C-alpha cells in the first residue's frame, strides 16, 4: 500500500522515474523494519513468548517446534492457526520465482526500476500492481485467461475499470494461455496463445498474480484431525 501511495504522489518532472522508484523502495524498507520492531516489542511486553521456528502438529493439543538450535513440544488447550497465505505459482514451463520473475511479495523488493512489466493475472493483486507501476512510469501489460476484465462483475462496471487502466497506458491480452517462459539477465520472454493464435511478449520483469494458497503444507494438520 505504501508503494501504491508513493506512485500516485509522484511529482511531475522533479525526479527521474527510476530515481523516484528506487527512493520509494528504500523508504518502504525502512518503514517496514521500524514497524516490525515496534510490533515485536509490543507483543513481548504483553507477556507473550515468541519462538521463531518451524511448527507442526503432533496431536490436537501438541505442537512440535524446530528452531535453528533445538526442538521442543508445546502443549496447549487451543491453537489459533494464523499462518497466512503465499502466492500460487501455476505449473508453466520455465516459470520459477527467481531473477526477473516475481510474486507480489518479491516485486516490492525490486530496487531496479522495471521500464516494462508483464503481469500474469487480472485479479485484484494484478490490477493493483499494474496501476502502481504504471504510475511509477513502467509500461505494463496484463495477460489473463478471461475474455474480458472482471468477468464476474457487471459488464458496464468492468468496462469503466478497463477504460481507466487504458488511460494509465496499461495493455491487456485476454483469452490467453501462457505455455512457456524464458528469462535472461535483462528480460523475460513469455510465450502464449490467444484465440487460436500464438503470441510472444518481452518485458524487463514478470509478475505472477494468479491467486494465493494457505500456508499449511508443513503443519501436518491431519495429526490434529483438521481437514484442509
Language model region names:
Residues 96-100, 136, 159, 223-226:
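Glycine-rich, phosphate-binding/catalytic loops in enzymes
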Amino acid at each position: 500500500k505504501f508503494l501504491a501511495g508513493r506512485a500516485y504522489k509522484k511529482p511531475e518532472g522533479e525526479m527521474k522515474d527510476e530515481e523516484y522508484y528506487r527512493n520509494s523502495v528504500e523508504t518502504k524498507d525502512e518503514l517496514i523494519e521500524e514497524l516490525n520492531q515496534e510490533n515485536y516489542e509490543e507483543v513481548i511486553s504483553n507477556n507473550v513468548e515468541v519462538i521463531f521456528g518451524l511448527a507442526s502438529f503432533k496431536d490436537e493439543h501438541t505442537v512440535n517446534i524446530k528452531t535453528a538450535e533445538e526442538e521442543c513440544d508445546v502443549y496447549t488447550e487451543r491453537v489459533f492457526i494464523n499462518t497466512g497465505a503465499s502466492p500460487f505459482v501455476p505449473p508453466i514451463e520455465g516459470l520459477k520465482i527467481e531473477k526477473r520473475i516475481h510474486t507480489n511479495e518479491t516485486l516490492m523488493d525490486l530496487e531496479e526500476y522495471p521500464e516494462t512489466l508483464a503481469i500474469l493475472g487480472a485479479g485484484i493483486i494484478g490490477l493493483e500492481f499494474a496501476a502502481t507501476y504504471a504510475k511509477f512510469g513502467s509500461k505494463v501489460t496484463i495477460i489473463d485467461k478471461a475474455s474480458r476484465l472482471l468477468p464476474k462483475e457487471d459488464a458496464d462496471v468492468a468496462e469503466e475499470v478497463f477504460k481507466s487502466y487504458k488511460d494509465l497506458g496499461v495493455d491487456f491480452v485476454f483469452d490467453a494461455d501462457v505455455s512457456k517462459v524464458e528469462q535472461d539477465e535483462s528480460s523475460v520472454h513469455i510465450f502464449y496463445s490467444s484465440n487460436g493464435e500464438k503470441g510472444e511478449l518481452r518485458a524487463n520483469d514478470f509478475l505472477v498474480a494468479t491467486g494465493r494458497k494457505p500456508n499449511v503444507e508443513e503443519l501436518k494438520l491431519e495429526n490434529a484431525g483438521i481437514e484442509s
